């Protein structure tokens, strides 16, 4: 009787493996053409067991990324993913397109103003949405008033007034004595006051400027790395690395300001032709607009 009882118990244990609520394990098969066939099971909305077969083709895409980001991707997994292979897992991760989303802080207020403005102002906004800000001093994507070199370099159109027509002096300036208009004109813009003074970074500025222009800079360059490279020759007062507004990568040029022009000349001589991140740097003194 004991043997019959044990057999009955064993038969009951065997029946437990045929539980209809249990799903078979996922099967991954590697094909000869390099693709993978993944077979998995799931329950549909009606509670029926459904077999899902996916054929995956792996494509290797070579991409240049920041070395620090690549190092973090090679870290060992932890937590519930501890011990799993590197890369995303099909069970827990759904790989999709990388979408860059930059929300605005006051986007609700801006949307309300756009609706109140009407179609006329909305069309102007659509016309200006593709416009980019360009600095008149270093040609960077920022406002000229925020340029870090506004005190050391002159803007490109500084001498635009020098090419005025010869007969322009005979026309009375607006806002002066006897003018027929009531619009106010500042004294420094009136007739005869153009030569009364010069801007701080004008042509009378001292000639011992110590700003270097570095070109052929890698997209992965950082301001701290450039500072470390040039501080070997003297005290660096400012480092400006032009970046793209969309990708935040370097645009290929930078400005390095030294406290002493002698240090800048030595750095220009040593760093011109220096290899940095598989590129050859081109270093020269920044030229002011004439």
UniProtKB/Swiss-Prot annotation:
GO terms (BP aspect): formation of cytoplasmic translation initiation complex; translation reinitiation; translational termination
Keyword Nucleotide-binding carried by entry: no
Region (Disordered): 1-34
Localization per record: Cytoplasm
A GO CC term attached to the entry: eukaryotic 43S preinitiation complex
Keywords, in A-Z order: Cytoplasm, Initiation factor, Protein biosynthesis, RNA-binding
Domain of life: Eukaryota
UniProt-recorded Gene Ontology molecular function terms: RNA binding; translation initiation factor activity
PANTHER family in UniProt: EUKARYOTIC TRANSLATION INITIATION FACTOR 3 SUBUNIT G (PTHR10352)
Stated name of the protein: Eukaryotic translation initiation factor 3 subunit G
The species this protein was found in: Neosartorya fischeri (strain ATCC 1020 / DSM 3700 / CBS 544.65 / FGSC A1164 / JCM 1740 / NRRL 181 / WB 181)
């Amino acid at each position: 009787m004991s043997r019959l009882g044990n057999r009955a118990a064993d038969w009951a244990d065997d029946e437990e493996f045929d539980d209809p609520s249990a799903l078979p394990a996922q099967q991954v098969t590697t094909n000869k053409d390099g693709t993978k066939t993944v077979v998995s099971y799931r329950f549909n909305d009606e509670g029926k067991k459904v077999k899902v077969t996916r054929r995956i083709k792996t494509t290797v895409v070579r991409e240049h990324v920041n070395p620090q980001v690549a190092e973090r991707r090679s870290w060992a997994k932890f937590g519930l993913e501890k011990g799993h292979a590197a890369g995303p897992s099909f069970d827990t991760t759904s790989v999709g397109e990388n979408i860059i989303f930059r929300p605005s802080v006051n986007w609700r207020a801006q949307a309300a103003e756009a609706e109140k403005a009407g179609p006329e102002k909305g069309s102007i906004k659509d016309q200006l949405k593709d416009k980019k800000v360009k600095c008149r001093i270093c040609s960077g994507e920022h406002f000229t008033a925020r340029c870090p070199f506004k005190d050391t370099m002159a803007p490109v159109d500084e001498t635009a007034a020098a090419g005025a027509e010869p007969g322009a002096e005979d026309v009375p300036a607006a806002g002066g004595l006897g003018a027929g208009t009531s619009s106010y004109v500042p004294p420094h813009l009136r007739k005869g006051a153009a030569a009364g003074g010069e801007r701080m970074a004008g042509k009378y500025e001292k000639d011992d400027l110590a700003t270097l222009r570095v070109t052929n800079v890698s997209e992965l360059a950082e301001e701290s790395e450039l500072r470390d490279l040039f501080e070997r020759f003297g005290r660096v007062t400012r480092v400006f690395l032009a970046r793209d507004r969309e990708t935040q990568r370097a645009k290929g040029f930078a400005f390095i300001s030294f406290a002493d022009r002698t240090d800048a000349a030595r750095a220009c001589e040593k760093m011109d032709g220096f290899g940095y991140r598989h590129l050859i740097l081109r270093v020269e003194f920044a030229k002011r607009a004439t």
